[in-house]
Amino acid sequence: TEKKLLAALAEANAQAGFTKDAPLAIVVCGDMTKAIEGSGHEFWVQDCAAATENILLAAHAMGLGAVWTGAYPLEERSSEMGKVLKLPETMVPLSVVVIGYPKGETKAKDKWDAQKVSYNVYGGQDM
């Protein structure tokens, strides 16, 4: 909620300039010292993505507006956010959830296209 910090986070992500005007933001990070070793190492991304989505759902349930902005895998962006937050090298910011009060009700875009749904195998191909 520190305004200088929110402004610095906004500067680190050109697509999220609105962060500077928000009441708060939550930075979701992966701790590489706790990540699975070996072939499952990258599961930290899924763990953090699930946490990010849960934050969005909780904010919505509380009547708040929330936006998921990305950091990782954009090295420059995640590195800059790490500097702003003084994170150790073992902590990688995956996302920033910017939270505030909605200005009004927005209508969801209808992007449903039944032609893009596959059943059993991709594209309705025969097995």
Predicted segments, located by residue:
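Acidic, surface-exposed loops and disordered segments
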Residues: T1-M127
